[in-house]
């Protein structure tokens, strides 16, 4: 059962739907999303906290570009959902989702990307099956949750995950990124110097603009194995604080 795009760009709709039985719905993609290109202002901000979404497998773009929706979803059972791409992207959603069961999640890219309001505790999220967190918090300028305990062992793409996330300063030293292949733009425009010296970057191929416009970053990453990297373009562009010896890096595969 699908509700894909049901109220997409329905800018005037703001009626109560709290009593709906959505227990058989599997797809809620773009259900209440706005339109970035026309600057349409969505008005939907109703209480749907009691919805039974336990059958939903994808929430992709459900509230993206909806600047007003900010209702409590803390009790939602999202344990069967695998796709959360852009769910709250470019919105102002800022509610507690710390208890969400993300054990089935695989794709979280851009989930809060462009959301300048979101700043909730996500430290206990189980992302052990997630493969993609690209742009997850890009331009989420107030987000500062502790993510040090996240199990990232299955993640392959972290490109832009914290791009211009100005408030973010979590310890990421224990992240397992051994399966990651792309980390372009990862810390671009950030204001902290993460201790990532021990990261296993041996499978990385793309480091484009990774530290671009970082004014603080100056960690010793001299021991990084970058032998598989093919793209380092603009990697340290305008990284005004960086001054470490990386003379021993093997850049023979960079093209």
Stretch-by-stretch model annotation:
Residues 1-255:
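Negatively charged
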